[in-house]
A protein has these predicted regions:
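Beta-strand/loop-rich accessory regions of lumenal/periplasmic or secreted enzymes
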Residues: 1-139
């Protein structure tokens, strides 16, 4: 979701593989942003990874391809995938807007220059250390 489309999204606790966080558009384009996230965990098949939380909330997207690979592809099958996790952690994300077929984004949603205060906390974990309960209490 993005600032101008978040009202259509459900708030909840989700467990999804990275591949499920993307939308397979006919013409590859930026996608998969998660908006106003409280915390997120990223881990491998051995349950080794890290937990991140933001103060205040944060946005993230996670893919197995880089922004450059996405930009260079003209069709989904041309995206060059990688084994690594490509993670974008953001204080805020710009609105989508729809100026090509509708109005500009609302002014209040635009990110404007200025001072801001933001912090992120990271905590590594291994094996069974992370479960549904510790996800909410580890940081």
């Amino acid at each position: 979701a993005y600032p101008d489309s978040k009202e259509a999204q459900k708030v909840g606790y989700y467990k999804l593989p990275v591949e499920a966080l993307s939308t397979n558009y006919t013409y590859p384009q930026e996608n998969g942003n998660r908006h106003e996230v409280r915390r997120a965990a990223f881990y491998d098949d051995k349950m080794c990874g890290f937990l991140v939380s933001g103060a205040p909330l944060f946005d993230f997207s996670a893919h197995h391809y880089t922004a450059q690979a996405l930009e260079e592809a003209k069709h989904p099958h041309e995206i060059e995938y990688c084994d690594e996790l490509v993670l974008n952690l953001n204080w805020k994300s710009a609105p989508l807007g729809s100026n090509s077929c509708g109005p500009l984004p609302e002014d209040k949603l635009l990110i404007k220059p200025g001072d801001f205060k933001f912090s992120m906390n990271f905590r590594g974990f291994a094996g069974a250390e992370l479960d549904d309960k510790t996800f909410f209490t580890m940081i």
